[in-house]
């Protein structure tokens, strides 16, 4: 995972295209217009109702005018004609309006319209009949009245006058209420009047004629009037009006429902459009945020470009990257902790601002527990700032914590601190924080691997140089051991022969002392070539330092003060105390050479716990428990340009004063053999400090005598020791040493010579054989079977002999040169075994 994010097609999918939003806006506007626009033609509907009401009014006015015309109140028939014309016009307008209206006109409406037309036509016919006959009737009534009024003046008889009065009374009754009886009675009176004319024949004749006209026309006029008065035009118009109102009401209800529905649809579309626009704006803002995040990732990558693979560059790069993350999320602080998955301790921590925060253990453990228990990729929590860092309880603010598994061993916990309580978190921001944290962890891991790779390359290069030097030095040291063995052997024998103090004895002592120093140099060379046999046992570093403290004081100059400091914790390690002794001797010797005047060397032994991985000057040390052996001085210090090369073999800044360049190289070799780590810090003019981290041991420590043995040299009791050495000079030296130790030596040049000697029935208690005399690929068990006894192999530091679990009891390997005491211990140990 590289921590980078590229917007995908899914990120740009907002749920609606711009043209679809525009279509929804148009649809919402159309639905809104349909909802606010009236579907019915209200003007037409009102005109229909007006025409129906006008028909009612015109019909009533027509009936009124007909009654007035019948009563003779009006003699002009023009109002009746105009009313009738208005009625017909209203009917035509009504038909036209019904065609224009949106009312649903069914059969009922059509039938009512037809009935209304028929009623108007019937009324028209009745009015026409009424008009023609009513004129005649009114003329007849007028003539009848005039004749009746002049008849008494012209008649000469009282009977005629009486009959005319009776006739006038009957005619008045007939006009008011026509009936067949009155008609017969009036006809009878007219006949009677004609018979008794009494000289008034003209008035009587007019009276009789007009009377009979009235009797014949008045019923027809009354019928026409009754037909007009009983016309159902108004009733049909009222029924039609009710039907229209019902249809209008029903259509209004339907229209209202439809408008409510359309309005609801329009409102719903508007809400949906608003939500789409809101989502589109949020998505746009989110994509803008993602693009800003891409720039942040690029800036984080730039922070880790170059700078070199060092701890300081890693810290500065991580600090700059956290500052970018802090600025991106508008936080007040930003910190990152890499916590070990197992022990839940912060292995590394970084912060955007210095100093780094002190993480609260409870918060770390809680987040680690949640991250381990949760199957999801990350765990998000919001906590008070004082619960995340070791801050005072009154510290305000909150912290946004995100924990996720960075690797199989580490859990990354990122903290964003906010002043006050203005934190606003959302899933998108948490996702971006997770991606940014993963990206940062990726770059940190890459930088760490780069650092480790560079360190491994330097160590490999250093190991290759050591191997090359060791290969060369091993061959040279082997030849020197042969020469030095002869020198020390003869010197020790001469020393044993000269018991008294003399000049010769002192010279021999100097020879042995110089030989011992030469042997130490050869041991250092063999340390570089890894050709020394190591005996490892648990021992206390504190006890060892106290044991060799007098030796260290004697080895240093008088102007140098040596101080020791030990803590109460156990400082048991597993290894060889000789290696620790040699490390201290070399470090103290180097420190003493750094003083031009008085100085002080501090040796401290302590037990420490390293909570996170630590980058040293020459390697990387994992977190854990260690025994720390520190040697520090206040001398001149080491130059920065020299510091990377101090552990290289034969590198020295004091070649003119006899420096060999093997001391610190041997120290580095011993530390590696003890599976430890070494770190050095130095400042010119202020001093140097060497810190040696050794893995502790839980075993019970042994006493120093288990390594160094007692002071008295063990001697033999005449046991036969066979010796195989092709070099006659060395063979003679070894024979003299063996004889001086109380044993009976028998020397042979080859293994075959020894086997021939054994085949003759001879038997040796022990066999000493030089490495060069052994055939290749022969096991120690085969030697034991051939020699019939145990063997001691001289110069066996680089022996390529196959060993089994039983071989160690049948052979012992001694590196050259061999001192008399070492040989005495080896022979006595194998013979007793």
Curated annotation (Swiss-Prot):
Pfam families from the UniProt entry: DAHL, HATPase_c, HisKA
Chief localization: membrane
Top-rank EC class of the record's enzyme: transferase
4-aspartylphosphate carried by residues: 770
Membrane topology: Multi-pass membrane protein
Entry GO MF terms: ATP binding; phosphorelay sensor kinase activity
Regions crossing the membrane: 19-39, 260-280
Catalytic activity: ATP + protein L-histidine = ADP + protein N-phospho-L-histidine
Residue positions, PTM Phosphohistidine: 478
Occurrences of domain Histidine kinase (ranges): 475-698
A Gene Ontology term for the protein's cellular component: plasma membrane
Repressor in keyword set: no
EC number(s) reported in the record: 2.7.13.3
Localization, UniProt: Cell membrane
Domain Response regulatory: 720-831
UniProtKB keywords: ATP-binding, Cell membrane, Crown gall tumor, Kinase, Membrane, Nucleotide-binding, Phosphoprotein, Plasmid, Transferase, Transmembrane, Transmembrane helix, Two-component regulatory system
Function: Activates VirG, by phosphorylating it, in the presence of acetosyringone or hydroxysyringone.
Protein name: Wide host range VirA protein
Organism, as annotated: Agrobacterium fabrum (strain C58 / ATCC 33970)
Gene: virA
């Amino acid at each position: 995972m590289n921590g980078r994010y590229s917007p995908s097609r899914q990120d740009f999918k907002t749920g609606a295209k711009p043209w679809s939003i525009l279509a929804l806006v148009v649809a919402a506007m159309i639905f809104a217009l349909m909802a606010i626009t009236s579907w019915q033609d209200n003007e037409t509907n009102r005109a229909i109702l007006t025409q129906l009401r006008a028909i009612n009014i015109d019909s009533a006015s027509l009936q009124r005018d007909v009654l007035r015309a019948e009563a003779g109140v009006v003699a002009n028939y023009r109002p009746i004609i105009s009313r009738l014309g208005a009625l017909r016009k209203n009917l035509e307008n009504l038909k036209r309006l019904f065609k224009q209206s949106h009312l649903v006109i069914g059969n009922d409406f059509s039938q009512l319209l037809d009935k209304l037309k028929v009623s108007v036509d019937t009324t028209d016919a009745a009015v026409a009949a009424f008009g023609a006959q009513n004129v005649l009737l009114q003329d007849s009534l007028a003539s009848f009245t005039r004749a009746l009024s002049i008849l008494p003046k012209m008649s000469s008889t009282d009977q005629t006058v009486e009959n005319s009065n009776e006739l006038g009374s009957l005619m008045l009754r007939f006009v008011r209420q026509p009936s067949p009886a009155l008609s017969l009675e009036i006809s009878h009176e007219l006949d009677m009047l004609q018979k008794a004319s009494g000289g008034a024949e003209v008035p009587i004749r007019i009276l009789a004629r007009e009377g009979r006209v009235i009797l014949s026309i008045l019923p027809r006029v009354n019928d026409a009037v009754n037909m007009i008065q009983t016309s159902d035009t108004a009733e049909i118009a009222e029924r039609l009006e009710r039907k229209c109102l019902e249809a209008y009401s029903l259509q209004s209800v339907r229209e209202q429902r439809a408008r409510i529905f359309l309005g609801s649809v329009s409102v719903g579309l508007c809400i949906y459009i608003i939500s789409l626009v809101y989502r589109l704006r949020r998505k746009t803002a989110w994509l803008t945020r993602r693009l800003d995040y891409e720039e942040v990732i690029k800036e984080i990558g730039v922070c880790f470009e170059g700078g070199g693979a060092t701890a300081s560059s890693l810290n500065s790069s991580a600090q700059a990257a956290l500052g970018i993350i802090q600025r991106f999320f508008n936080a007040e602080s930003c910190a990152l902790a890499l916590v070990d998955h197992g022990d839940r301790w912060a292995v590394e921590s970084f912060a955007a601002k210095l100093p780094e925060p002190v993480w609260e253990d409870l918060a770390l453990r809680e987040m680690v527990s949640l991250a381990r228990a949760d199957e999801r990729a990350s765990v998000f929590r919001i906590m008070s700032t004082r619960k995340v860092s070791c801050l005072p309880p009154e510290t305000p603010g909150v912290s946004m914590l995100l924990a996720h598994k960075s690797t199989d061993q580490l859990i990354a916990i990122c903290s964003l601190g906010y002043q006050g309580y203005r934190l606003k978190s959302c899933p998108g921001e948490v996702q971006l924080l997770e991606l940014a944290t993963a990206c940062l962890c990726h770059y940190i891991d890459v930088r760490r691997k780069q650092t480790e790779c560079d360190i491994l390359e330097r160590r490999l290069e250093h190991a290759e140089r050591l191997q090359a030097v060791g290969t060369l030095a091993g061959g040279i040291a082997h030849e020197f051991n042969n020469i030095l063995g002869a020198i020390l052997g003869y010197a020790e024998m001469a020393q044993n022969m000269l018991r008294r103090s003399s000049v010769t004895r002192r010279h021999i002592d100097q020879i042995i002392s110089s030989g011992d120093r030469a042997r130490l140099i050869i041991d250092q060379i063999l340390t570089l070539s890894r050709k020394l046999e190591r005996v490892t046992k648990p021992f206390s570093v504190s006890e060892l330092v106290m044991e060799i403290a007098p030796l260290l004081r004697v080895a240093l100059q008088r102007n140098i003060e040596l101080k020791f400091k030990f803590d109460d914790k156990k400082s048991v390690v597993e290894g060889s105390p000789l290696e620790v002794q040699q490390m201290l001797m070399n470090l103290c010797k180097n420190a003493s050479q750094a003083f031009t005047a008085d100085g002080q060397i501090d040796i401290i032994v302590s037990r420490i716990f390293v909570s996170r991985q630590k980058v040293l000057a020459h390697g990387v040390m994992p977190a854990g428990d260690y025994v720390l052996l520190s040697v520090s001085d206040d001398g001149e210090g080491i130059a920065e340009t020299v510091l990377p090369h101090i552990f290289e073999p034969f590198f020295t800044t004091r070649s003119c004063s006899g420096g060999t360049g093997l001391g610190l190289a041997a120290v580095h070799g011993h530390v590696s053999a003890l599976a430890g780590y070494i770190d050095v810090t130095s400042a010119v003019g202020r001093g140097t400090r060497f810190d040696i981290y050794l893995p502790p041991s839980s075993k019970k420590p042994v006493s120093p005598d288990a390594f160094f043995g007692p002071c008295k040299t063990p001697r033999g009791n005449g046991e036969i020791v066979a010796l195989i050495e092709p070099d006659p000079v060395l063979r003679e030296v070894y024979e003299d040493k063996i004889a001086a130790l109380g044993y009976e030596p028998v020397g042979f040049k080859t293994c075959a010579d020894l086997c021939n000697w054994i085949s003759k029935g001879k038997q040796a208690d022990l066999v000493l054989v030089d490495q060069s005399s052994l055939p290749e690929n022969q096991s120690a068990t085969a030697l034991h079977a051939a020699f019939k006894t145990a063997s001691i192999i001289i110069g066996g530091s680089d022996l390529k002999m196959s060993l089994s679990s039983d071989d160690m009891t049948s052979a012992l390997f001694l590196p050259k040169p061999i001192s008399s005491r070492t040989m005495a211990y080896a022979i006595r140990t194998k013979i007793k075994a």
